[in-house]
Amino acid sequence: MPLRPQEIGSIQSRRDFCKWMGLATLSASMPLWTPPVLANSISSKWLTIESIERVTLNVPFRDIPARAMAKEVPHWVYSEVLQVKLKSGVIGFGETMLFYTWKTTSDEVVKEAIGKNAAEMMWRDDLGAGLQIALFDAVAKSLEVPVHALLGTKIYNETPLSWWNIDTSPEDMAAECKLAHQQGYLAYKTKGRPWFDLWAQMEQASKVVPPEFKIDMDFNDTLLDAERGIPILKQFEHYPQVDIWETPIPQSDIAGNSRIVKEMKAKVAMHYGNPEPFTVFKEQACDGFVLGGTAQTLMNANAACKIADLPFWLQLTGTGITAAWSLHFGGVLSQAKWPAVNCHQLYTHTLLTEPIVVKNGKATVPDKPGLGFELDQDALAKFRTDKPSVRPDPPRMIETTWPDGRRMLLGSHGVLNFILKQANLGNIPYFEHGVTTRLVPNDGSAQWKELYDKAGPEKPLFL
């Protein structure tokens, strides 16, 4: 079990801890890690970027994720796959989730990259996810080494992975947990939301998986504060499957998060970087982190977490392409001890010719050149589509009902995460037993449109 912040073994006293924290704070503005420089003796002809091909895909969700994702994030089906060809003929590939990523790849950076040395460009933070992955893949293939060899020393031969789905009905959550376990996973991450019955979700899911299978829940602030959140969380401590609560309340509430850490048996995770990491370390506001972003971001954050002796899970999301990329970081980052969340389980296809195999909760870190997987060209042809100019956002309306007969309608009205935003504003009733939510099909009728127009975006419509 990972050490909680108050149990950091390398620090012998609170006084030593504070002294160390002072030094750490002084160094917070300095890079903790710098990217390596490949030998200049490598002929530029092997690493010069000759062309970059970009293809937009619409990769369908599986049935259960399709029902769940349709409410707030139907646009997650869109990815851009990039194939970088070097003068040597080597081709590297990568992907960007077009509407959920640390950065998309711009036309300008693609134009700039042509004729440049791939090894000199690959660490840049402005590349966008897909181009960065593709460059690393191409360079590693050219050197006949796995991507992880470009990142550092491999210290783990296997790395833990988590199954992911957004908030669902208790029945669908149990079905997903069961499927995850059948496919070798020992962790499942989902969302904790006041528009679903948390008690029914945990009860049904815990019945279909063994105690060693862990369930992590991301609240995205919806518990609102420690005073109200702690009594809710304590009601789930008897489940052996409960493992990590992510962002139970706003991360800016350092005192509240510190209180939750101290009072909960389960661990607390926060997104790295907000608030400033060394403040979180000092105030013991979490047990570990959620970590995503550029290659340099990941390496630097790992260095900081190593000093603090805190774990994290990698959260690099997309299809199997991004999951393959994540495996290499899982092999070299010492603090990547919690199961990585890649979300590739959502889709009907991994975009790889072979799946990522998980056994006993872990996947093997590839040792073949590049990413260690091959791109499925047939899948690219099958799922190819036009690139949307803006985030696709069809009008959607959800209906939430409670056992006492209350009904709530809320329309999307062009607002991203439109239900979550209302919950964070306190406009949705707090967590209750028996609550459930469904997407109201848009039948094109005047009645549907009338209700939709009344239901938001400023506040939900209660009937």
Locate the predicted segments by residue:
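C-terminal extensions of enzymes
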Residues: 28, 353-463
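Shared catalytic-loop signature of beta/alpha-barrel
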Residues: 109-111, 118-119, 241, 252-267, ...
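N-terminal secretory signal peptides
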Residues: 1-13
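Metal-dependent enolase-superfamily TIM-barrel catalytic cores that perform enediolate-based chemistry
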Residues: 152, 156-260, 264
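N-terminal export leaders
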Residues: 13-31
